[in-house]
């Protein structure tokens, strides 16, 4: 039987684009795992997507996954828009290319490995999982900012 995992994800960016971070809190039964990372120049949407992607990559076996995100871009993109984008060769209905195709394709490849429910949660509210993911994302962003500061 597949194991159940609950994941909270978030992204943070100073400027858009700018230094950014992503974070995720994974909960399995009685255990939890926190992960975070950064990019020196990125966007808020890329960090939101990276948080979900990296969290899914942590999972070593097929799982039933609930992903909570405060990004409607991520939730709608992966559950609604992606199917048309793929049919349209990664173009939107107005023939403009879809942004972040590299990450959408990587996320899509993770879908076949798990049963995933994508849930939207209001950001910066009272959801403890989202608050924890936000703190991790901010930690990643601050790391990126420190690196840039050291480089002058």
Swiss-Prot record:
<dbReference type="GO" id="GO:0000287">
    <property type="term" value="F:magnesium ion binding"/>
</dbReference>
<dbReference type="InterPro" id="IPR022892">
    <property type="entry name" value="RNaseHI"/>
</dbReference>
<keyword id="KW-0460">Magnesium</keyword>
<protein>
    <recommendedName>
        <fullName>Ribonuclease H</fullName>
        <ecNumber>3.1.26.4</ecNumber>
    </recommendedName>
</protein>
<dbReference type="InterPro" id="IPR012337">
    <property type="entry name" value="RNaseH-like_sf"/>
</dbReference>
<feature type="binding site">
    <location>
        <position position="134"/>
    </location>
    <ligand>
        <name>Mg(2+) 2</name>
    </ligand>
</feature>
<feature type="binding site">
    <location>
        <position position="48"/>
    </location>
    <ligand>
        <name>Mg(2+) 1</name>
    </ligand>
</feature>
<dbReference type="InterPro" id="IPR002156">
    <property type="entry name" value="RNaseH_domain"/>
</dbReference>
<keyword id="KW-0479">Metal-binding</keyword>
<dbReference type="GO" id="GO:0004523">
    <property type="term" value="F:RNA-DNA hybrid ribonuclease activity"/>
</dbReference>
<keyword id="KW-0963">Cytoplasm</keyword>
<feature type="binding site">
    <location>
        <position position="10"/>
    </location>
    <ligand>
        <name>Mg(2+) 2</name>
    </ligand>
</feature>
<dbReference type="Pfam" id="PF00075">
    <property type="entry name" value="RNase_H"/>
</dbReference>
<dbReference type="GO" id="GO:0003676">
    <property type="term" value="F:nucleic acid binding"/>
</dbReference>
<feature type="binding site">
    <location>
        <position position="70"/>
    </location>
    <ligand>
        <name>Mg(2+) 1</name>
    </ligand>
</feature>
<feature type="domain" description="RNase H type-1">
    <location>
        <begin position="1"/>
        <end position="142"/>
    </location>
</feature>
<dbReference type="InterPro" id="IPR050092">
    <property type="entry name" value="RNase_H"/>
</dbReference>
<comment type="function">
    <text>Endonuclease that specifically degrades the RNA of RNA-DNA hybrids.</text>
</comment>
<dbReference type="GO" id="GO:0005737">
    <property type="term" value="C:cytoplasm"/>
</dbReference>
<keyword id="KW-0378">Hydrolase</keyword>
<dbReference type="GO" id="GO:0043137">
    <property type="term" value="P:DNA replication, removal of RNA primer"/>
</dbReference>
<dbReference type="InterPro" id="IPR036397">
    <property type="entry name" value="RNaseH_sf"/>
</dbReference>
<keyword id="KW-0540">Nuclease</keyword>
<comment type="subunit">
    <text>Monomer.</text>
</comment>
<feature type="binding site">
    <location>
        <position position="10"/>
    </location>
    <ligand>
        <name>Mg(2+) 1</name>
    </ligand>
</feature>
<comment type="similarity">
    <text>Belongs to the RNase H family.</text>
</comment>
<keyword id="KW-0255">Endonuclease</keyword>
């Amino acid at each position: 039987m597949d194991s159940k995992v609950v994941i909270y994800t978030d992204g943070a960016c100073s400027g858009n684009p700018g230094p950014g971070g992503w974070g995720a809190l994974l909960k399995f039964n009685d255990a939890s795992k926190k992960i975070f990372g950064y990019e020196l120049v990125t966007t808020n949407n890329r960090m939101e997507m990276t948080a979900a992607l990296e969290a899914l990559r942590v999972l070593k076996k097929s799982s039933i996954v609930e992903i909570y995100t405060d990004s409607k871009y991520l939730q709608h993109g992966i559950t609604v828009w992606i199917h048309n984008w793929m049919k349209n060769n990664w173009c939107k209905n107005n023939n403009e290319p879809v942004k972040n195709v590299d990450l959408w394709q990587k996320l899509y490849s993770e879908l076949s490995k798990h049963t995933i429910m994508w849930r939207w949660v209001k950001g910066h509210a009272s959801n403890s999982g989202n608050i924890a993911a936000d703190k991790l994302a901010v930690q990643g962003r601050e790391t990126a900012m420190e690196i840039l500061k050291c480089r002058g």
